[in-house]
């Protein structure tokens, strides 16, 4: 059973929890409720305690706020956050002075942090899917000597799984390099421009990776900008394959096809990933690698797809212009597009079921 809060701690918690905006700045600073040039506010949502402050302009989980306070050697906030319920062992991830180590030990911290706890912290931060969470994760985890081999291996597996097809598995990859690519991919996927700018300022060799992320996450406007204006280019068929990693990437598939990419290769890549929307869009554009696609489907155990690809019921969509290269025109063309050949196979499957 946790010990009761001291009167001083309870008062601070009450003040931090109030919605009143008229409390004087000097009073808040005197009470230790001022952090990163803003009032420190506390609230509870679904049983989790969050901190509002000026840090990154976002709400932060109390346990994550503790990690930041420890990294900053803000001893008063370390004590306060721990008294409010932060898990003191999380402090071990960012301790960088003997004084902080001694203080956290006095507050009950263990000598080492379990891999499971580290993994929980990582997922807790990344769960928010914001620019701030990416920047925060970078500040806590990049080149952190506290990361042990077991956790590093676990994190590698997570990254390879989430970036399947976008990143090549190499045992020689540095964990820090993988983390940066993972965070950058997240920033592109969810349009977190602040995080993209943050990573671009710190790392100058991400142009090709950015191009690949734009392809994978169907970002046609950004792709057009980097490909034509900044001249960051790779083989067009490799681009088309990257566009087929995720399903329903019609914009970037069309864009790469209009640049001269092989639509049959795109069709086969889509079969490999079982991306049905992509497969039939490729057929709409003239793809006809039916036998090869059926063979790949059979090898992967996609039995219905294997059978459906050898049916003599498909043809290209004559209503699709094949020479558009301006993102606005492509977006307008495909905004409400319904695949002709996907409709054909759906009608066929309804008849036989």
UniProtKB/Swiss-Prot annotation:
Q: Which domain of life is it from?
A: Viruses
Gene Ontology biological process terms, A to Z:
taxis
Main function:
Plays a role in virus cell tropism, and may be required for efficient virus replication in macrophages.
Return the similarity comment.
Belongs to the asfivirus MGF 360 family.
The protein, known as: Protein MGF 360-13L
Recorded source organism is African swine fever virus (isolate Pig/Kenya/KEN-50/1950)
Q: What is the lineage of its organism?
A: Viruses, Varidnaviria, Bamfordvirae, Nucleocytoviricota, Pokkesviricetes
């Amino acid at each position: 059973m946790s010990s009761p809060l001291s009167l001083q701690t309870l008062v601070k918690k009450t003040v931090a929890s109030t919605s009143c905006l008229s409390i004087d700045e000097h009073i808040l600073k005197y009470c230790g409720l001022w952090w990163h040039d803003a009032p420190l506010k506390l609230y509870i949502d679904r049983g989790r305690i969050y901190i509002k402050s000026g840090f990154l302009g976002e709400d932060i989980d109390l346990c994550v706020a503790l990690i930041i306070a420890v990294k900053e050697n803000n001893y008063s906030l370390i004590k306060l956050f721990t008294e409010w319920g932060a898990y003191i062992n999380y402090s071990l991830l960012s301790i960088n002075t003997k004084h902080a180590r001694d203080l956290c030990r006095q507050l009950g911290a263990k000598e080492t942090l379990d891999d499971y706890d580290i993994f929980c912290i990582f997922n807790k931060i990344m769960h928010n899917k914001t620019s701030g969470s990416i920047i925060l994760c970078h500040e806590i985890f990049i080149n952190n000597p506290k990361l042990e081999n077991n956790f590093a291996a676990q994190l590698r597996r997570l990254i390879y799984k989430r970036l399947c097809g976008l990143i090549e598995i190499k045992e020689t990859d540095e964990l820090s390099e993988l983390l940066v690519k993972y965070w950058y991919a997240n920033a592109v996927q969810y349009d977190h421009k602040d995080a993209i700018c943050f990573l671009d300022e710190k790392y100058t060799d991400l142009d090709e990776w950015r191009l690949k992320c734009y392809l994978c996450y169907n970002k046609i406007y950004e792709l057009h900008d980097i490909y034509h204006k900044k001249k960051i280019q790779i083989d067009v068929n490799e681009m088309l394959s990257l566009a087929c990693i995720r399903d329903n990437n019609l914009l970037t598939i069309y864009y790469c096809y209009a640049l001269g990419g092989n639509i049959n290769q795109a069709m086969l890549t889509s079969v490999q990933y079982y991306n049905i929307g992509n497969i039939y869009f490729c057929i709409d554009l003239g793809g006809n690698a039916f036998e090869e696609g059926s063979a790949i489907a059979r090898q992967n155990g996609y039995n219905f797809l294997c059978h459906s690809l050898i049916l003599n019921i498909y043809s290209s969509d004559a209503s699709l212009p094949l020479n558009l290269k301006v993102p606005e025109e492509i977006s307008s063309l495909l905004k409400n597009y319904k695949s002709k050949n996907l409709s054909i196979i759906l009608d066929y499957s309804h008849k036989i079921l």
